[in-house]
């Protein structure tokens, strides 16, 4: 992802979420945020810290004790914040509010190989059949 500043870190039900605000990367895009959820942030990742493209900010949260039986995964969201957004008290409900953030499809900006898994995918079936 692009360089930015950590604006919020908060608990989610599997770990912690990190919100990064990125400055304009092109004049047509403007400011945007990226959210990385279900993580364990590195000790040096705190609100106000500048992060650079390629920095390791966190590891995946251990979900083995989750009552929901969810496999470890990264929840990644991308959006454009409103001009009036406040990061104080930022939680997942903030991400759902279109008056505060307009969500965008993050897949076009991921510059690494990825695979979107569907419930019927053989890898999904194999992973779900294992005890974790």
Predicted regions: what they are:
Residues 1-41, 73-75:
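Zn2+-dependent peptidoglycan hydrolase active-site motif and core
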Residues 2, 18, 58, 88-92:
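Generic, low-specificity signal for short hydrophobic/alpha-helical stretches with a mild N-terminal bias
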Residues 4-6, 25, 60-64, 92-95:
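Residue-level detector of functional hotspots within protein domains
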Residues 18-20, 52-67:
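Short hydrophobic beta/alpha edge segments that flank linear recognition/processing sites
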Residues 46-52, 62, 69-132:
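Acidic, glycine-rich catalytic/binding loops that coordinate metals and/or anionic ligands
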